[in-house]
Amino acid sequence: RQHRLLARLGPDLLADPPDLDEAVRRARYRGDAMIGDVVMAQDVACGIGNVYKSETLFLERLDPFSPVGAHSDERLRGVFDRAQALMRENLRGFPRATRHAPGGSRYWVYGRSGEPCFACGAVIEMRRQGEAGRSTYFCPACQGPPRSG
């Protein structure tokens, strides 16, 4: 029998296969919430933390401060699919990486505030997001301007 608190958790993105449709369904209930907050909500999908949030949303070219309701189910599914792919690539341990370039940064945006974007050259920014004030790294040119919140 499952503990009642475990029943509230979203699908495990490292399950084989992960239930991405359930993650999208749970994300939909957060219509006005910022996608950067929603992807880290463990009752939506389990496993996405700060690094994977910033890296996934960058690779999917989504504004982390946009409302989840502004995105199609297909785009949301793409976010969860990308996150699970990045997490699977890093199952073998540290150092964790989402970008593979000799002698370069292991990340596209995470921890790179003030540095140039590898894709377009714009300056990577960091803003606090959500009630917990978690850091969110993003490229304002590749991902669109941040919205208030």
Task: Indicate where each model-derived feature is located.
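Short cysteine-rich clusters marking metal-coordination/redox-active sites
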Residues: 117-120, 139-142
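Low-complexity, intrinsically disordered Gly/Pro/Thr-rich segments
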Residues: 118-128
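Short linker/helix segments within small regulatory modules
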Residues: 128-135
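Phosphate/anion-contacting hairpin/loop surfaces
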Residues: 1-48, 52-61, 67
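A broadly conserved sequence feature marking short terminus-proximal activation segments
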Residues: 57-111
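Short functional micro-motifs and their immediate structural scaffolds
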Residues: 53, 124-126, 147
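Short metal-binding segments enriched for Cys and/or His
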Residues: 143-149
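Short metal-coordination and nucleic-acid-contact micro-motifs, chiefly zinc-binding Cys/His arrays
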Residues: 41, 110-114, 135
